Amino acid sequence: MDQTFLETLFPDFLEIQDQALRTSCELAMWMAMEHSGWTRENIHDVPVTLNWKNCDVSWVEHVTDVTRMCILEFDQMKKYYARHGVSFDRDLVVAGALLHDIGKLTEFVPGEAGGTVHGPNYQLLRHPLSGAILASKAGVRDDVVHLIAVHSFEGDHSYQTLESQFVRTVDIFVFQCSVHGLEKR
């Protein structure tokens, strides 16, 4: 695992104070990259979606935006949770924001003729499930694995922790901004 590369790609890994959690999250991301052929050279080619025509938002940009917004919103809103005596875990929010879409590294793969194509199992294991599996294999805590698994429509009728609800809401907002005005395929 190239920790320096990952922390350069996503400096917000350094926002995770729990060293064991940070290390397991970085390992999960590295494993996801290696599993599907994404490298230092082509990681910026991973799209956030293949389902919208002309979407020019990369996976790296999307994950960065979701994570930064989660950190900013958490730091602003934690006063309400504290005021009401509600536990709200910043490390869990940051880790979940960074990893919520790691399954996209298997859902989308580099095409043999260039570009990006759907991976061989994308219909069987959409990114929330494949991401949760990868994170679990890397030893990521179950509360982060839960967040990954329920962050998309697969989680519509599932139990949500406060942190998973929070990241999911920010993710939906950022994604909608990314595709606003584009035509769905």
Residue ranges with predicted function:
Residues G114-K137, Q165:
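Divalent-cation-assisted or electrostatically stabilized phosphate/pyrophosphate-binding catalytic cores
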Residues H84-F88, V93-V94, A132-S136, V140-R185:
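Histidine/acidic-rich helix-loop-helix segments that form or flank divalent-metal centers
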Residues H62, H100, H127, H151-S152:
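Histidine-centered active-site/metal-ligand motif
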Residues M31-A32, V60, L129-L134, G139-V140:
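Generic detector of short, locally flexible boundary/turn motifs and exposed helical patches
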Residues M1-V117:
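Acidic/His-rich, divalent-metal-binding segments that scaffold phosphate/diphosphate chemistry
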Residues S58, R90-D91, Q123, H127, ...:
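Short, well-structured alpha-helical patches and their helix-loop capping segments
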